[in-house]
């Protein structure tokens, strides 16, 4: 991701914010300090499944409008998406990844077939407008 942004969006700067996995008060202060230093930032991405937590921190700090992109169709993420606190959710289809992984393992171990080194997987982009029509997932 960083390399892509550097090569294709050179006028954009990535800013890394490290958050604690379970300390909400510290995280809120960290984000508050970040926006004091970078008040112009209006969009962000998180590469873990807890996008909803960041969305609610931003809501507490009244950072609206803010375009947040998150990962994984966890129920709290979907709720935040529907509430407009997350703009986009990426679904990596973990059940399909698991199926293809087990299939490749079986083909390699049982049938002694060579398996491809790369296996490109679909990623679905979900919004508040299309989430209710998305049927290819299970909430975790």
Across the structure, where does each feature detected by a protein language model lie?
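Short beta-strand elements at the ligand-binding edges of bilobed clamshell
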Residues: 83-95
């Amino acid at each position: 991701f960083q390399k892509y942004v550097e090569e294709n969006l050179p006028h954009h700067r990535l800013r890394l914010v490290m958050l604690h996995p379970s300390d909400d008060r510290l995280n809120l202060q960290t984000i508050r300090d970040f926006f004091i230093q970078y008040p112009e930032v209006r969009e962000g991405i998180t590469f873990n499944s807890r996008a909803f937590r960041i969305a609610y921190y931003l809501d507490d700090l009244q950072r609206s409008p803010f375009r947040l992109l998150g990962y994984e169709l966890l129920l709290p993420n979907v709720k935040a998406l529907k509430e407009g606190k997350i703009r986009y959710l990426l679904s990596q289809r973990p059940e399909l990844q698991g199926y293809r992984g087990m299939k490749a393992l079986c083909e390699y171990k049982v049938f002694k077939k060579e398996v491809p080194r790369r296996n490109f997987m679909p990623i679905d982009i979900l919004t508040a407008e299309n989430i209710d029509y998305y049927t290819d997932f299970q909430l975790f």
